[in-house]
Regions:
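The conserved beta1-alpha1 loop
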Residues: 91-95, 282
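N-terminal cap/lid segment of alpha/beta-hydrolase-fold proteins
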Residues: 23-85
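C-terminal catalytic histidine-bearing segment of alpha/beta-hydrolase fold enzymes
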Residues: 279-281, 285-298, 302-344
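Alpha/beta-hydrolase
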Residues: 93, 199, 313-316
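Short substrate-entry loop that stabilizes the transition state in hydrolases
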Residues: 83-87, 96-137
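Primarily recognizes the serine-hydrolase "nucleophile elbow" in alpha/beta-hydrolase
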Residues: 148-217, 224, 229-234
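Mobile cap/lid helix-loop segments that gate and shape the active-site cleft of serine hydrolases
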Residues: 49-57, 193-194, 198-270, 276
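Bacterial N-terminal signal peptides
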Residues: 8-17
Length: 344
């Protein structure tokens, strides 16, 4: 049965590439079964057959480059083997536990796939590892250090330090928005980025705006099993994005604070004043709380005259939206690439 699924998936991908970019129909059906959870192994089971096996061709990869004082402050750089320099740079900041590589069953190419897509589309890719911090803005400081590393070093990897774009997903939105929204975290060249894509953002601090409660909680659901899938035995760090890397700092600086302090920590004023162009995107199968917050964020920015590009990815889930890049399905990457090219 599994072979049959992927036989039709490959056919569908080919058809989508020739006609209209979309989630392959069989995979779209399976994603509905998988549901609105953080279903990494289940979604990787569907998408891994559509990706090449490493080692990859046509790309130079440097892994685990240090960008900060913590041993976990590392990033990967993907650049083309051939071709010129001064390319736009895509800095990817993942969701979940912040891992730049998922690992686990079928997880070996995620999120190399985002980097490979970037290189194939004329960019240099940088994949950042996230980790917890001791202060409320500790993870945001890490984002700032990664941006500064890119600004200072990416020219030697064929990148243009003046055209750096951040693509962040899920939990990665929290430290990214804090970095952009607080100029005291910026480096000597200012914010250091040309644009930011907030993909499937969970609620972050945009006080005084407060997202209304979603009926029934609206959070992530349980994961259904796609056809032919057998769940692996549970292991630590199974890629489901629970635990240490939720994008907020940990330790004594993270605890409960009074209302005035919380308001002062709001990202909204700084997001508005930064003048950085934003794209906000959600998946059709994202849970209601994600979609609700994204729409509120869009509205607050628009009220301030800072309307963001807003996209909903049809048939995609919270996880498939980041596993589909570098396949024939360009329903996610097409709008992203168009937006990047539109930013002057």
């Amino acid at each position: 049965m599994q072979k049959k699924i992927f036989f039709w998936a490959v056919i569908a991908v080919g058809a989508a590439g020739m006609a209209q970019a979309a989630v392959p129909p069989q995979i779209a059906k399976e994603l509905v079964t998988v549901g609105k959870g953080v279903c990494v192994p289940e979604t990787a089971f569907l998408y891994r057959p559509l990706h090449p096996n490493p080692p990859y061709t046509g790309v130079t990869i440097l892994r685990d480059i240090s960008f900060g004082p913590d041993p976990k402050d590392v990033l990967d750089v993907f650049s083309p083997e051939k071709g010129g320099s001064k390319r736009p740079v895509l800095l990817y900041i993942s969701g979940g536990a912040g891992n730049k590589l998922q690992g686990g069953p079928n997880g070996d190419v995620f999120y190399d796939n985002v980097m490979l897509w970037a290189v194939k589309n004329g960019m240099v890719g940088v994949n950042m590892q996230r980790h917890p911090g001791q202060e409320w803005n500790g993870p945001a400081k890490d984002v700032g250090m990664a941006v500064q590393w890119v600004n200072q070093n990416i020219a030697s990897h064929k990148g243009n330090p003046d055209r750096v774009f951040i693509w962040t997903q899920s939990a990665g939105n929290i430290p990214t928005s804090t970095y952009i929204g607080h100029s005291d975290l910026w480096g000597p060249k200012g914010v250091g980025v040309k644009g930011v894509l907030f993909m499937s953002p969970p609620a972050f601090d945009i006080l005084p705006a407060t997202p209304p409660p979603v009926q029934g909680g609206g959070g992530f659901g349980a994961c259904g099993k796609p056809t032919g899938y057998t769940a692996p035995a549970p292991v630590a760090g199974d890629g489901r994005g629970r635990g240490a890397g939720d994008g907020r700092g940990r330790g004594p600086g993270r605890g409960q604070v009074d209302a005035a302090t919380q308001l002062a920590r709001s990202n909204l004023p700084g997001l508005i004043s930064s003048k950085v162009p934003f794209m906000i995107a959600v998946a059709e199968l994202d849970p209601p709380n994600i979609t609700s917050f994204a729409e509120i964020l869009k509205g607050e920015l628009c009220k301030a005259g800072r309307c963001a590009t807003y996209v909903t990815f049809k048939d995609h889930s919270h996880i498939s939206e980041v596993m589909s890049p570098d396949t024939a399905d360009t329903s996610v990457t097409g709008p992203i690439l168009k937006w990047i090219k539109s930013v002057k």
